[in-house]
């Protein structure tokens, strides 16, 4: 079996005793791009935080490659092979591009391995190679998005969680970033793509789930989801 399988089993997660996630169950198959669609307030980011151990679930299980990670601390979840590209293109503005990327490999003890990963990332993102000494805070939004994705790849994840990669970007940069996400998946990395941009997301995904009010409201292939009238009414205008 390929690595990167994530299983969410009847998960409830609460803020201030109010359940935001109400029995969410879904499976991210290895080697695929699985998307999680939903409007603001649907529970998408809460689910990402629960997977990462930042907002632990109240009930249910989260299983990664056969191991129960529900109660693990975040650093151990990352060490198990899960990385996250957070919403909002978060970079360290006072660090250079290269320094930002190297932060992603903080758990790797071999300088040789870290250097090899850095070279690979710079091949994926030639623009970052050209600007490796530039302060990340002086870069454009699209370039900062590349830095954020590259930093996530530096830990050689089995599963990459990408939260709202289109947020605040021009249509051209959105298309470019989604092309990069597809190429990352083609390298064998499983992707869970959390998005509101339905058209672009379904175009590159193998399977998807729609979250509404903390529950899975629909699931299926991109073709199946696009054919559903309730999904079309909610997301296709």
Where do the protein language model's features map onto the residues?
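Conserved catalytic motifs of ABC-family nucleotide-binding domains
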Residues: 156
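The feature captures the beta-strand-to-loop junction immediately N-terminal to the Walker
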Residues: 37-39
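Helix-to-loop junction immediately C-terminal to a conserved catalytic motif
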Residues: 52
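ABC-type ATPase nucleotide-binding domains, specifically the catalytic core motifs of the NBD
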Residues: 16, 34, 72, 97-116, ...
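ABC ATPase C-loop
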Residues: 152-153
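Conserved ABC transporter NBD signature motif
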Residues: 60-67, 80, 114-118
């Amino acid at each position: 079996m390929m690595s990167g399988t994530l299983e969410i089993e009847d998960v409830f997660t609460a803020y201030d005793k109010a359940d935001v996630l109400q029995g969410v169950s879904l499976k991210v198959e290895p080697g695929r791009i699985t998307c999680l669609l939903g409007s603001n307030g649907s529970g998408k980011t809460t689910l990402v935080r629960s997977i990462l151990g930042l907002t632990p679930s109240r009930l249910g299980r989260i299983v990664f490659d056969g191991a129960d990670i529900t109660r693990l601390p975040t650093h151990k979840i990352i060490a198990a092979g899960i990385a996250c590209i957070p919403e909002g293109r978060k970079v360290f503005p006072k660090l250079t591009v290269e320094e930002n990327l190297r932060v992603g490999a903080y758990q790797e003890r071999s300088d040789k391995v870290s250097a090899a990963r850095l070279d690979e990332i710079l091949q994926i993102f030639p623009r970052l190679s050209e600007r490796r000494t530039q302060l990340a805070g002086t870069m454009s939004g699209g370039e900062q998005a590349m830095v954020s994705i590259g930093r996530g790849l530096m830990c050689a994840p089995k599963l990459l969680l990408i939260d709202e990669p289109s947020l605040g970007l021009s249509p051209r940069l959105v298309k470019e970033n989604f092309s990069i996400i597809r190429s990352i998946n083609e390298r064998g990395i499983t992707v869970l793509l959390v998005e509101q941009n339905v058209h672009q997301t379904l175009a590159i995904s193998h399977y998807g789930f729609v979250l509404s009010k903390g529950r899975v409201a629909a699931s299926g292939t991109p073709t199946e989801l696009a054919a559903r009238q309730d999904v079309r009414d909610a997301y296709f205008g």
